[in-house]
Amino acid sequence: MYTLARQLLFKLSPETAHELTIDLLGAGGRLGLNGLLCHRPASLPVRVMGLDFPNPVGLAAGLDKNGDAIDGLAQLGFGFVEIGTVTPRPQPGNPRPRLFRLPQAEAIVNRMGFNNLGVDHLLARVQAARYSGVLGINIGKNFDTPVERAVDDYLICLDKVYPHASYVTVNVSSPNTPGLRSLQFGDSLRQLLEALRQRQEELAGRHGRRVPLAIKIAPDMSDEETAQVARALLDTGMDAVIATNTTLGREGVEGLAHAGEAGGLSGAPVREKSTHAVRVLAGELGGRLPIVAVGGITEGRHAAEKIAAGASLVQIYTGFVYKGPALIREAVEAIAALRGERPVGTH
């Protein structure tokens, strides 16, 4: 069924198809229909960050930026759903066109620029949703906030989303907000992490529960830079790392239509680079901090490869665009086979 749906959606511009998909998933979620349209994965429970996941395959941030289809996405069988990136104030993002398909490579180039309706709108959608599973909320800074004041935006968002999130992801790795990636390095990173950690402790006391903080990093750092990030995460008491965001590289798509468009490349071509980052992180972290792996999972075995590389959880987005909900089940089954476990029933 998804093959036909994809053929129809791919006749539309990528962003129009994206918007229509969110609308349809949202409507299906409200009616409880989405779970009837696909074979949901069996249960493969895992506990990470102190949270219980029904399976280790989640939706990466970026598909549902405003929380408009939380119930609909959950009904497809994701073990967890991450929404956003959201900023303190609404912003339109970069001019269109800003989203490009590279179907020959099962890839997408985007330069969306954190387009979203703001954190208050997102929280209204979260409160309207019936979903009671693991919900991640991905936070960022507004385009017009100077990088040296970025911490202010992250703290505003953290304050607001904290009571409603299962975990919070701090996005310092989008290539489409000028200067943002500089926050991944040196003193800038440590100052941001220390401010977030201090606020997390204050909020935990206020709300009576500790919401884990994850940091999402880029795949374009050297091994030593990635190792330095890992050490900073340990030193400042972060709870998880998500590896990775999109790449500025164009390896594997040279000569394809839209390959030269500015923006971050996701999908199959980023797979090896992202998995390599997971291996580097795993070597440095030594099991002291969980890794959520994302990047280039277009088949179930790719999810298992990332678990084997050291990840505890995986996320999909571009692969979901190309393969549909069946990829969730394939990934769960591949991870179960890797672990020598048998998934139980359906959830």
Curated annotation (Swiss-Prot):
Main location: membrane
Alphabetic keyword roster: Cell membrane, Flavoprotein, FMN, Membrane, Oxidoreductase, Pyrimidine biosynthesis
Compartments, as annotated in UniProt: Cell membrane
Alphabetized CDD domains for the sequence: DHOD_2_like (cd04738)
A cellular-component GO term for this protein: plasma membrane
Residues annotated as catalytic: 174 (nucleophile)
Residue positions binding substrate: 65, 110-114, 171, 176, 245-246
Bilayer topology annotation: Peripheral membrane protein
Broad enzyme group: oxidoreductase
Cofactor(s) the protein requires to work: FMN
Residues bound to FMN: 61-65, 85, 138, 171, 216, 244, 267, 296, 317-318
Molecular functions (GO terms): dihydroorotate dehydrogenase (quinone) activity
GO biological process, one term: 'de novo' pyrimidine nucleobase biosynthetic process
Reaction equations catalysed: (S)-dihydroorotate + a quinone = orotate + a quinol
Pathway: Pyrimidine metabolism; UMP biosynthesis via de novo pathway; orotate from (S)-dihydroorotate (quinone route): step 1/1
Intrachain disulfide bonds: none
Superkingdom classification of source: Bacteria
Assembly with partners or alone: Monomer.
Record's function text: Catalyzes the conversion of dihydroorotate to orotate with quinone as electron acceptor.
UniProt record similarity statement: Belongs to the dihydroorotate dehydrogenase family. Type 2 subfamily.
PANTHER family: DIHYDROOROTATE DEHYDROGENASE (QUINONE), MITOCHONDRIAL, DIHYDROOROTATE DEHYDROGENASE (QUINONE), MITOCHONDRIAL-RELATED
The name this protein goes by in its record: Dihydroorotate dehydrogenase (quinone)
Gene: pyrD
